[in-house]
Regions:
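Short, membrane-interfacial amphipathic segments enriched in basic
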Residues: 1-7, 147, 187-188
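Secretory targeting signals
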Residues: 5, 18-71, 95-160, 172-179, ...
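Short amphipathic alpha-helical coupling elements at transmembrane boundaries
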Residues: 5-13, 82, 86
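Transmembrane helix boundary and interhelical loop/hinge segments in multi-pass membrane proteins
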Residues: 47, 68-87, 91-92
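Extracellular/periplasmic helix-loop junction at the C-terminal end of a transmembrane helix
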Residues: 179-196
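Membrane-interface capping segments at transmembrane-helix boundaries
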Residues: 229-238
């Protein structure tokens, strides 16, 4: 079967699963809400107004991870994957279509999230907020980071074949482990996927990565996870 019909079928699956629509809605709401709360705190002479405006992505990316995880985990319940592969025997093509079907809505919602968060942040911070040039970089970086984290989770879920296992690893990692490693060794932490991608959300940076190189590192993590997921789907029984 050609790629486009497979992609269309995977997009239909996403539109018809309420949990996935809820996860995408949570990306926007959680990111904007936590960013508004962070922006409302006192910020006299804030050295990093851009990150204050986009602070909520630290929590919004959890919803993005839940989206990517659930989209793939649904295939491993009730024999759904066997039916899918019966219709699309080319497993790498199917998994590529699944990844694209996750990336497209994640990017669209990410761009919406970036725009809403920027407008909220500038409205709350006022004159102390980021410039429009910084804000545009932050909005695009926000969209790319959310998309890449959703894809990273999707690839890991394909390897583990369990949404619960994936979330049990990634959520504590994002909320606890990443910060602990960051306190112990900033050199290592700079190259973790969540921290590398968020460099684009800072007004200035002094580490080894810049905004776009940081996103490139995050993209490498996501690509590695997706390749591992494709290998797992191709080699293991459905």
């Amino acid at each position: 079967m050609p790629f486009v019909p497979v992609l269309r079928a995977e997009l239909i699956k996403i539109r018809t699963l309420r949990s996935l629509i809820g996860a995408l809605a949570a990306v926007v709401l959680v990111t904007a809400a936590f960013s508004a709360l962070a922006s409302a705190a006192p910020h006299e002479n804030d050295p990093d107004p851009l990150f204050s405006a986009f602070f909520g992505i630290s929590f919004g990316q959890i919803a993005a991870i839940a989206f990517g995880t659930t989209a793939v985990a649904a295939e491993f319940r009730g024999g759904a994957l066997r039916l899918t592969l019966a219709a699309t025997p080319d497993r790498p093509r199917w998994f590529a279509a699944k990844a694209a079907a996750i990336a497209l809505p994640a990017l669209a919602v990410g761009l919406l999230t970036g725009a809403v968060t920027l407008l909220v942040g500038k409205a709350v911070l006022g004159a102390e907020g980021p410039t429009w040039a910084e804000g545009l970089r932050g909005a695009v970086g926000c969209a790319l980071q959310l998309t890449l984290m959703a894809l990273f989770a999707a690839g890991l879920t394909a390897v583990l074949r369990s949404g619960v296992a994936t979330l049990s690893i990634l959520i504590p990692f994002l909320l606890i482990v990443s910060f602990v490693i960051g306190d112990m060794s900033s050199g290592i932490a700079d190259f973790l996927p969540d921290r590398a991608g968020q460099v684009a959300l800072h007004s200035s940076w002094d580490g080894p990565l810049g905004p776009w190189t940081g996103l490139a590192v995050c993209a490498l993590w996501s690509a590695a996870a997706l390749l591992a997921g494709m290998w797992s789907v191709s080699r293991r029984d459905a």
